[in-house]
Amino acid sequence: MLVYTSGTTGKPKGVMLSHRNICANVIDAVCGLELSQNTVNLNVCPLYHVAASVFQTLTTFYIGGTSVTLEKFDPQHVLEAIERERITYTFLVPTMIFRILELSNAEEHDLSSLVKLGYGAAPMPLDRLKKAIGLFGPILFQGYGQTESTANICILRSEDHDLEADAEKLERLKSCGRDHSSHEIRILDPDGLELESGNVGEICVRSSSVMEGYWKDPEKTREAIQKGWLRTGDMAYMDQDRYIYIVGRKNELI
C-alpha cells in the first residue's frame, strides 16, 4: 500500500507499507485495545490516513467486526451514528471532540455502547479532557504514530486518564504514552546513542510495522531508517516509567 505523508517537512513522500507492516500493526491494535468480533467501529477521519484505514478499518475487518464510515465530520452526525449504530470504538482528533462538547444537546444522546474512544495528533487540555470524560465516560486513550510506522507507535491508555490520580500521574496526561505492544522505542542522540530518561532526543522506533521505505526516494529512506531504527523526526524525552513527552519536531528546534 502506498500512503502519502502530510508533508510537514516539505513535499509529501510516498510511504511504502507492506502486507507484513499492516498485519503487524493490526495485530498490535487488536491485542492492545482488546477488540473483538463484537467491535463496531466508526470512521470519522479520512480513509487516506493510516489512523482510519489501518488502525480502525483493517483492524476491525481482521477480527470480523463491523465498520461504519461517515462521509465527512459533523459533530451532530457523529453522536447520532454512535447512538443509531451502537458504535463501540472510534478515533477522533481533539478539535473534533471539542466541537462535540460544544453541542447543547450532546448529553441527550445514548452513548453507552462506546467502550473505546481514541484521540491523537495532540494532547488535550485538562479542562477539555474532564468534559470529554464526563460525556463519554472513562474510555479515552491517546495514540501517537506516523505513516512511516503504519499508524500507532505508543498509547496513553484509558487507565492513565485517571483525573483523581496524584500530581505525578496527572503529569502523564502531557505525554503521548509508552511502548505499544511489539514496538521498541528509544530516545537517541544524533549519533544513535540511547539517552537516559529526562534527556531530549529523537524518538526512534524498531518493529515489524516500520515502512519498507519512501517510494522512489532511496536517499530519504536511508535518512529515515538507520541500522533498523525509524528516526521519526519527533524530539522528546522519556521518563523513568517510559512515558514519552514530545517537545517538537527535529527541524523546528533551535
Locate predicted features.
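Conserved AMP-binding A3 loop
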Residues: 1-24
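Conserved pre-ATP/AMP-binding loop-to-beta segment of ANL
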Residues: 1-4, 11, 34-40, 181, ...
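Conserved S/T- and glycine-rich ATP-binding loop of Class I adenylate-forming
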Residues: 5-8, 41, 47, 82, ...
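Short beta-strand->loop structural element characteristic of the AMP-binding/adenylate-forming
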Residues: 13-16, 43, 65-72, 141, ...
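Conserved AMP-binding/adenylation subdomain of ANL enzymes
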Residues: 23-40, 48-89, 102-104, 158
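Residue-level signal for inorganic ion chemistry
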Residues: 64, 82, 90-93, 192, ...
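Gly/Ser/Thr-rich phosphate-binding loop
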Residues: 87-92, 101-171, 184, 194
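Conserved ATP-binding/catalytic segment of the ANL
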Residues: 174-179, 183, 191-198, 202-254
